[in-house]
Amino acid sequence: MARGRLYSICVSPERGQIKQEVAEAEVITGFGIQNDGHAGDWGRQVTCLDWESVQRVNREKGLDIGPGQLAENLMIEGIDLSRVAAGDKLKIGTETVLKVTQIGKEDHPSVVTRALGISLLPYEGLFCQVIKGGLIRKGDPVEVLV
């Protein structure tokens, strides 16, 4: 089982906004991250990106993309998320469990592509449902459960 850590947590009150980084967040079973506009009763409650992928894009494109700018909720460090499959689960901290429901999504003009000219969620984003909620904090351990 792959292990890493939670690099960042980001939320926005409404869709279509750049997300803001927070130190901790309450994750609600079957809903998503409290105070995030993408939370709800659907399959894409929480979005995850690989921090190493963001760093690669920064190097290749000469950008300085940081947490929240790609519309992700969670950036994970130390796990190759390209090896995670739909149906796999991510355990964050001591109790929170997310189930990967989708990898990537339709690519459409968004606040991210208009601002940065690039978007990773359509190609590398993990979209998840919350199987078990709890409090998560920046730096928490992350483990892939298959």
PLM feature segments, named:
Residues 1-146:
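Metal-cofactor-dependent catalytic cores
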